[in-house]
Amino acid sequence: MKLSLVLIIYRSDSSIALEASKFCEEVLKAKNIKSNRIASDFHRDEIEKNLYNTKFQPDIGIVLGGDGTFLKCANALADYDIPLLSINIGGNLGFLTQEKDFLFDKSFIEILENEEYIIDSRNRLNCNVCISERSPEKKIIKSYDALNDFYFKSVEEAISPTNQIQIEIDNEKVNEYKGDGLIISTSTGSTAYSMAAGGPIVHPSIDAMIINPICPMSLASRPIVIPNTSKVIIKPVKKSKGEIKLWRDGSKCMTIKETYYCEIKKGKAPCKIIKFKKSTNYYNTLIKKLDWKGDLSLKNSKN
């Protein structure tokens, strides 16, 4: 890959990420590659300024932080078709990031120049918040995109976490979940909040949506995996509080009133993630990040 301009985005609350961004800038400069550096607490207009008020659009974005930093950048940049290289600087699990050694030993430049990487396109979800009206044309109030997940929780979570949510899949009313909330996840997001709530781990190459209730009051309410070509409708049930709160990739979006509904489906623009061929594969990542031990009986057996 020939690089002319790189957008560097670093985790705003991390001094380590700030220093790493300066180091990255110097490495690129030594190769005569221009770069723009911004913190992850950017506003949307700042991104547009970096993309449109320059002569050239960035060839790639380099994200320095953890998965949380990457998720914000992914949702801001995916619509512009810019591949993202995420390097784990100060993050925790880091399922979406490369190891920091690639940055500090400067090997990331060689890998990019020699094209020793793949571009992994990850599907996102789109959520349209609409007003429930009898009109044949839906009225969209707000639209959001998510790489990991959307989830719905009580508006009074600290006082009364329980809510009741109705779900329809492809125009079929499927269930009413009563509990602490509901997660709609991509395959990529299956190792995030959904996994913590007892959902299945789904390989990111599988085009799927995971519907996972959070602490449901019925044992019959189980996670289900559906094709990501499905259309999912979420509505708050009147007989509960009549309102629920919508979250996206760990960030609060808005309150869904009893006269609203959410239409969730596959997003239009995928997120393009640069993955180095030298980095560990998906299963090794699971073993490392989740501290899996493998077959302990084999380790204890005598030959």
Curated annotation (Swiss-Prot):
Binding-site list for NAD(+): D67, G68, K72, N148, D149, K178, D180
One family name in Pfam for this protein: NAD_kinase
Function: Involved in the regulation of the intracellular balance of NAD and NADP, and is a key enzyme in the biosynthesis of NADP. Catalyzes specifically the phosphorylation on 2'-hydroxyl of the adenosine moiety of NAD to yield NADP.
A Gene Ontology BP annotation from the UniProt entry: NAD metabolic process
Active site: D67 (proton acceptor)
Family membership: Belongs to the NAD kinase family.
Cofactor: a divalent metal cation
Cited SUPFAM superfamilies: NAD kinase/diacylglycerol kinase-like
Keywords in alphabetical order: ATP-binding, Cytoplasm, Kinase, NAD, NADP, Nucleotide-binding, Transferase
MF GO annotations: ATP binding; metal ion binding; NAD binding; NAD+ kinase activity
Places the protein is found: Cytoplasm
Lineage: Bacteria, Bacillati, Cyanobacteriota, Cyanophyceae, Synechococcales
PANTHER family noted in UniProt: NAD KINASE (PTHR20275:SF0)
Cited InterPro entries: ATP-NAD_kinase_N (IPR017438), ATP-NAD_kinase_PpnK-typ_C (IPR017437), NAD/diacylglycerol_kinase_sf (IPR016064), NADK (IPR002504)
Protein name as it appears in the record: NAD kinase 1
Main location: cytoplasm
Cellular compartments per GO CC: cytoplasm
Enzyme class: transferase
Catalytic activity: NAD(+) + ATP = ADP + NADP(+) + H(+)
Record's keyword annotation contains Electron transport: no
NCBIfam families in the cross-refs: PRK02645.1
Protein EC: 2.7.1.23
